[in-house]
Each structure stands twice: as C-alpha cells, then as structure tokens.
Amino acid sequence: MVTDLGGGYAEAEGGPVRHIPVLLEPVIEALEPSAGKVILDGTFGAGGYTSAILDTGADVIALDRDPNAIAGGQAMVAARAGRLTLHHTRFSTLDNFAPEGGLDGIVLDIGVSSMQIDEAERGFSFQRNGPLDMRMSGTGVSAADVVNRAKVGDLIRIFGFLGEEKQSGRIARAIEKRRVNHPFQTTRDLAGMIEIVTPRKAKDKIHPATRVFQALRVFVNDELGELAEALFAAERALKPGGRLVVVTFHSLEDRIVKKFFSDRSGKAAGSRHMPMAFERPATFEPVGKGMVTATEEEAEINPRARSAKLRAGIRTAHPAMKADFSIFDLPDLAEIERLGA
C-alpha cells in the first residue's frame, strides 16, 4: 500500500518511494520558461522543477524554508554558473525576491518534500520512527507541542478541518487521556495509539494515522496560511503576462488556489462575507482549460501523482488587488497557535 504524503512524495509500508517531480511536463508547459526569462521556484525541495526550468534556458530564483534543502541545493547552484540563486526563506515572502519589472513565472509545489520524509529525525513519517517534530524550518512549535499541550477541543478542530478526519473527536480524547501520564514523543508512539483507537478496516486504503499526521504537519507549518499569503505575493511579483503555476495534493490546498483564481478572474463569486457576486478588472486569466491532473500513465509509474492537481493563471496588466484573506473562508486558528508563544 502506498500512502500519498503530498509534495510529490509517497510512502510505502515497506519503505520510502523516491522523489519524482509530479506533473513535470504540464508544469513546464504552463510556465513556458525560455532563455531570457526569470522564473521563481517557491518550493525548491530536491530541485526537480528548478532543474527542468534551467534546462530550457531560463534563470531561476529558488526558495525553501528548509535549511537542509538549501544545503543540498548548493551543488546545483555551483553547476549552473550564475543562473540559479537559492534563498532560505518561506515562499510567502517571494515578492521580496522579484527583480525590477517583475517575474516571468512562479511555480509552487505544495506539501512535504522527499528529503523531509527520508529523515526520520524530522518526524514527518509514521513509517519511520523518530521525534514527533514535523517542522519544515526546524523552528517554532513542534507536533509534539501541539499533541501534548493543545486543548482537546483545539485538537478536534485541527484534526477535523486540516486533516478532514471523521474520527477527530475520538482520537483527540484518547490523546488527552494518554498524555497525562505518558506524553507523546515519537511518531510511532502517536501512530500506534491512533491505530488502536481507530483500527484499520479491510476497505481502508490509508493508514489510520494518515489524516492526523497531515493535519499536524499543515498546522505546525501553517501551510494553508503560507499558501494564501504566497498567492497574494505572486500577484504582486509577476509582470503582465507572467504565469503562476500551483500544484497541490489535497482538497484544502486546491480549494484555496481555486478560490484565489476565481476571485482574481474579474467575476468573483459571493461568499459568507460578501454574498452577492460582482465583476471587477481581472488580475489573472486562466491557462488552458482549467485544472490538470496526472495521466493514467504517470499515475501508474508514479502513484503519488494520483492526487496532484495543477492550476495556473496568466497575470494581466491590472494592478494587484488588496490581500483579502476572507475569500478563502479559513477558520481562525490563531488562538491555538498561541501555545507556541
């Protein structure tokens, strides 16, 4: 059985499956990189997209919040003779790295990277025992902090919304009971307890801990907030005609990207904050016919591609709009995040 972990990476029960860039051909087709263009890769990871973009003759500005990714990318920086610059930062800050006149393209591959999964000490995998960490940057609140300190109601919200876990209440209450005398310290420790509380059924395609681990990772790294901020930053950073390409791996991420492009299309749909739909100048036009998914051939070769979705837009000449996070209808998790203060 293969568990999709996002970010173009999957995990089999017998061990890890190596990284292969997901939807690589559609990404390059949507970006249209070429000599003389400057493309920003906001999620460098193992450098799969960056390498392919450089091969077209375009120059690349690459970002990653993981210091290990930055260290691992130095050989590529040296080999590409001044055509690649690599920065240790969150991709939500990408507009700080745009050259005068703007970027020709931006690609974001949302999710955990292969290197992060490979390293047991990072705590992303329940198949590889290690500290319950999950911090991409190595700083801030860890998954263990959340599991051992958050209120049970907050755990229910985290697991239910960010992991779409139907058994969030049962799991959260079991965590609360167990951590009083035995705080959770390792990935296998938490995964084992979840498997006892919600045992796997014959029809289940994923491990019982998959959604909880996803929720913790997304929460610890503020992945949805980072994505939302990055989309607004991309709107500011792209030149007219520049292209934004985003690859997501679960419905929460895809929903944010879809809502952003819809809102910026000039025909914004109504929301609970502004029920009436309205028209305004568009800042993005669609690329192609809409969402792109993996072909049957790619999904057969690379099982992790099955859940990948690509959405892309072309920047118009209209000025960037105000960053209005209400368009995403995200829950307010700020109170929970204070446990890191």
Swiss-Prot record:
It is found in: Cytoplasm. GO terms for biological process: rRNA base methylation. Gene3D superfamilies: Putative methyltransferase TM0872, insert domain, Vaccinia Virus protein VP39. SUPFAM superfamilies: Putative methyltransferase TM0872, insert domain, S-adenosyl-L-methionine-dependent methyltransferases. S-adenosyl-L-methionine binds at G47, G48, Y49, D64, F97, D109, Q116. It catalyses: cytidine(1402) in 16S rRNA + S-adenosyl-L-methionine = N(4)-methylcytidine(1402) in 16S rRNA + S-adenosyl-L-homocysteine + H(+). Its EC number is 2.1.1.199. InterPro entries: RsmH, SAM-dep_MeTrfase_MraW_recog, SAM-dependent_MTases_sf. GO terms for cellular component: cytoplasm. One of its GO terms (molecular function) is rRNA (cytosine-N4-)-methyltransferase activity. PANTHER family: 12S RRNA N4-METHYLCYTIDINE METHYLTRANSFERASE, S-ADENOSYL-METHYLTRANSFERASE MRAW. Specifically methylates the N4 position of cytidine in position 1402 (C1402) of 16S rRNA. HAMAP family: 16SrRNA_methyltr_H (MF_01007). Belongs to the methyltransferase superfamily. RsmH family. This is Ribosomal RNA small subunit methyltransferase H. It comes from Allorhizobium ampelinum (strain ATCC BAA-846 / DSM 112012 / S4).
